[in-house]
């Protein structure tokens, strides 16, 4: 198995000067973006200890101040997110994410004599051009908002999808490849959502000699090859299962599809895919070619394959979790250990026009980290006389490793109450 690493420009031009002082030389098919909302630039952050001062990405040390910038009004990367950079769960062979990645690699290695190149160490810090423009995300798309995406500066983001590397790899002459990596999105808090998760992108380019003589046009040829490939992958992972294709829309493929399988008496969406929009190929000097692409979320599939009930488990270092995957193989079913009791706390406040739930979740997560299991809106009403709207959220605190004390939870809740007033311009009730 050959895994490649390609050097790429990981910061925007606006960031280069800052990085040089530290020794630097210079779409998504999965999990649709949340709805658009206004964003209130973050105020000066309180440091919460311990704080990671630097991380290693592809052999390059990146300092905290390169990514978490209190003096930049467009920067919305908290320390809790910076600490996840460089952890690369997908490169751990005895971790559920790494096990699943390797199983997918095995499928492609076994079924394609013309091997797919593998890239899994590309920096998650990319330009807005790479993350949005190169994959045809419209200028007014909600995914570009500060409410949905982590911005390092106005031209640099933490990638929202592994598709951010697609154009760069095509321009460098790669035509069949798999890209795996950690991706970042501001999101809600519950058992299936986390601001950092892992994706795999697959891409395959065809030349005219591939489809000439088949009796099919280039688009149909690519679409049929894509479906054959992914149906085989689904059988490789899930066994003999019923499947169905659903037509859908992505800005970077046409036609576009979702593959669903009938698993445990329900239809499960496995991945999104499609025939690549011709303009993407043309911009990479491949105007005479056709291609297909797919993207899948590794956590989503791993939770199903390994029976993992909460996405936070993937980040756990508890031996009761990690030891269950020591063989590095599919087929293991997670055996839950004692589930510690939840602690419920409610918070109510009058919201402003700039309020968004993603911003609120970021505040809660920044304080409680993985001790918060869920944040849920349980009530809202509008006072017509005052012209104000109130939201009431229930925060569920629960550790996966120990029982939380009342004192701990009360302290966390108190900090949440203080911070939401300072950062979100809301009035507590």
Curated annotation (Swiss-Prot):
One of its GO terms (molecular function) is phenylalanine-tRNA ligase activity. SUPFAM superfamilies: Anticodon-binding domain of PheRS, Class II aaRS and biotin synthetases. GO terms for biological process: phenylalanyl-tRNA aminoacylation. Disulfide bonds: none annotated. Residues 1-53 form a transit peptide. Residues 338-429 form the FDX-ACB domain. Monomer. Belongs to the class-II aminoacyl-tRNA synthetase family. NCBIfam families: pheS_mito. This is Phenylalanine--tRNA ligase, chloroplastic/mitochondrial.
């Amino acid at each position: 198995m050959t895994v490649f690493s390609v050097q790429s420009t990981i910061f925007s031009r606006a960031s280069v000067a800052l990085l040089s002082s530290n020794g630097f030389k210079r779409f998504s098919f999965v999990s649709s973006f949340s709805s658009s909302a206004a964003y209130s630039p973050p105020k000066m952050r309180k440091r919460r200890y311990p704080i990671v001062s630097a991380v290693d990405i592809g052999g390059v040390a990146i300092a905290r101040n390169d990514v978490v910038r209190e003096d930049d009004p467009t920067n919305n990367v908290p320390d809790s997110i910076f600490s996840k950079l460089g952890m690369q769960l997908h490169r751990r062979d005895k971790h559920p994410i790494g096990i699943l990645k390797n199983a997918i690699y095995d499928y492609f290695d076994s079924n394609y004599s013309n091997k797919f190149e593998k890239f899994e160490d590309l920096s998650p810090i990319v330009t807005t051009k790479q993350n949005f423009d190169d994959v045809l995300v419209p200028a007014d798309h909600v995914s570009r908002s500060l409410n949905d995406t982590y911005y390092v500066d106005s031209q640099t983001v933490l990638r929202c999808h592994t598709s951010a590397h697609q154009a760069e790899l095509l321009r460098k002459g790669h035509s069949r490849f798999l890209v795996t990596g950690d991706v970042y999105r501001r999101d809600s808090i519950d058992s299936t959502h986390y601001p950092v998760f892992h994706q795999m992108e697959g891409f395959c380019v065809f030349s005219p000699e591939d489809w000439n003589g088949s009796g099919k046009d280039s688009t149909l040829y690519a679409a049929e090859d894509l479906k054959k490939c992914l149906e085989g992958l689904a059988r490789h992972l899930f066994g003999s299962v019923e499947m169905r294709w659903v037509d859908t829309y992505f800005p970077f493929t046409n036609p576009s599809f979702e593959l669903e399988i009938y698993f445990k008496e329900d239809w499960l969406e496995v991945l999104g895919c499609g025939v690549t929009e011709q303009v993407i190929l043309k911009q990479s000097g491949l105007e005479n070619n056709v291609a297909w692409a797919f993207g899948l979320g590794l956590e989503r599939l791993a939770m199903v394959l390994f029976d993992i009930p909460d996405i936070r488990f993937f980040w756990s270092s508890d031996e009761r979790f990690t030891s269950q995957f020591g063989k590095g193989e599919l087929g293991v079913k997670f055996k839950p250990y004692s589930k510690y009791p939840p602690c419920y706390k409610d918070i109510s406040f009058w919201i402003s026009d700039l309020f968004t739930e993603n911003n609120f979740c970021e505040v809660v997560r920044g304080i409680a980290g993985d001790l918060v299991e869920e944040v849920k809106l349980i009530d809202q009403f509008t006072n017509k006389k005052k012209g104000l709207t109130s939201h009431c959220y229930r925060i569920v605190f629960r550790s996966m490793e120990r029982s939380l004390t009342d004192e701990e939870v009360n302290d966390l809740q108190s900090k949440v109450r203080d911070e939401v007033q300072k950062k979100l311009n809301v009035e507590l009730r």
